[in-house]
Amino acid sequence: MDPTKAPDFKPPQPNEELQPPPDPTHTIPKSGPIVPYVLADYNSSIDAPFNLDIYKTLSSRKKNANSSNRMDHIPLNTSDFQPLSRDVSSEEESEGQSNGIDATLQDVTMTGNLGVLKSQIADLEEVPHTIVRQARTIEDYEFPVHRLTKKLQDPEKLPLIIVACGSFSPITYLHLRMFEMALDDINEQTRFEVVGGYFSPVSDNYQKRGLAPAYHRVRMCELACERTSSWLMVDAWESLQSSYTRTAKVLDHFNHEINIKRGGIMTVDGEKMGVKIMLLAGGDLIESMGEPHVWADSDLHHILGNYGCLIVERTGSDVRSFLLSHDIMYEHRRNILIIKQLIYNDISSTKVRLFIRRGMSVQYLLPNSVIRYIQEYNLYINQSEPVKQVLDSKE
């Protein structure tokens, strides 16, 4: 989130140590970059002389590996799909239940001709059972794990969790679609397996006009996730903080809950593995990272270097050119995955609030459950926002 919205914001100074400081890097799993390296990234010259004996040995190993893994038939497309998550009620679910072959095959069942798994869809009307509502006080807070995959499905992949920070006032279909677009690109382009996704709404200390109270925004996010997804969750920790929380510290919170307290995710071999945590954001956020005196360099290095960023391009934006021109972002470019929108969707929460104030329809811009919640509590009706914020906002 934009640090300038913090009530006590001061432009960061060079070499300034922010408080509280980011977590030590040794507490964050070293899963490597999200984008695979290419030849140009290696130190050795491409056309340097090579040892013929070593080349023959490597070629022999590759040939043996290929022959041992040869398949007698081409698998159907449906067999390539693996369930992302199952909705379980506790972390103590037995290994037999969580890893049964029959249960896995049921989850893989396709829905019509769509490339959507049953495990990705929650019932559109009934709120799933065993959902723990997020607390309204920090004393009652519990980290949500009810949809966190307990065990990796693919032994060749590494676990990854997606986190989206934002105001979500209100949450829209674009916010939900961003997770699905990121999921597609990660599955297709990387060596990671997504084991969960989280919305993290900002606290009431975020100084932006048009924000509904934090507990309303958290509840709307919960309704959107509960009724449309079975792998997305809402974490209220950031919204319950008494002061503005820097994005770097929010990612540290997820690392603490998942990797330090829980030891990561179980692998196919039964061992625990650290989970890579990545920030999901729109192109407008990455552009704000390039503005001088907005983000501290230490936070940018921490977010982009130790965690990583998934950037969904907006209409008309050119994130790649922007990365090329910014020193810190270019340094960590291998840990930034740019997600191209194949069907452009620029639904804006700011414009949704404007429509509500004007008595216009917001049907098909938000989940029905969120629309009903807004109507029930009369949210956004009597609010006003600066004209410039309405015209310029991409959030």
From Swiss-Prot:
Divalent metal cation. NAD(+) binds at S167, F168, T247, G282, D284, W295, R314, N345. ATP binds at H175, R209, T350, K351, V352, R353. Optimum pH is 6.5-8.0. SUPFAM superfamilies: Nucleotidylyl transferase. The keyword Ribonucleoprotein does not apply. GO terms for cellular component: nucleus. InterPro entries: Cyt_trans-like (IPR004821), Euk_NMN_adenylyltrnsfrase (IPR051182), NadD/NMNAT (IPR005248), NMNAT_euk (IPR045094), Rossmann-like_a/b/a_fold (IPR014729). Its cofactor is Co(2+). The modification Phosphoserine is found at S85, S89, S90. Residues 9-24 have a biased composition (Pro residues). Pathway: Cofactor biosynthesis; NAD(+) biosynthesis; deamido-NAD(+) from nicotinate D-ribonucleotide: step 1/1; Cofactor biosynthesis; NAD(+) biosynthesis; NAD(+) from nicotinamide D-ribonucleotide: step 1/1. Pfam families: CTP_transf_like. It catalyses: beta-nicotinamide D-ribonucleotide + ATP + H(+) = diphosphate + NAD(+); nicotinate beta-D-ribonucleotide + ATP + H(+) = deamido-NAD(+) + diphosphate. GO terms for biological process: NAD biosynthetic process. One of its GO terms (molecular function) is nicotinamide-nucleotide adenylyltransferase activity. The keyword rRNA-binding does not apply. Its EC number is 2.7.7.1, 2.7.7.18. Keywords: ATP-binding, NAD, Nucleotide-binding, Nucleotidyltransferase, Nucleus, Phosphoprotein, Pyridine nucleotide biosynthesis, Transferase. Belongs to the eukaryotic NMN adenylyltransferase family. Catalyzes the formation of NAD(+) from nicotinamide mononucleotide (NMN) and ATP. Can also use the deamidated form; nicotinic acid mononucleotide (NaMN) as substrate to form deamido-NAD(+) (NaAD). Key enzyme in both de novo and salvage pathways for NAD(+) biosynthesis. Predominantly acts in the salvage pathways via NMN. Present with 1430 molecules/cell in log phase SD medium. This is Nicotinamide/nicotinic acid mononucleotide adenylyltransferase 2. It comes from Saccharomyces cerevisiae (strain ATCC 204508 / S288c).
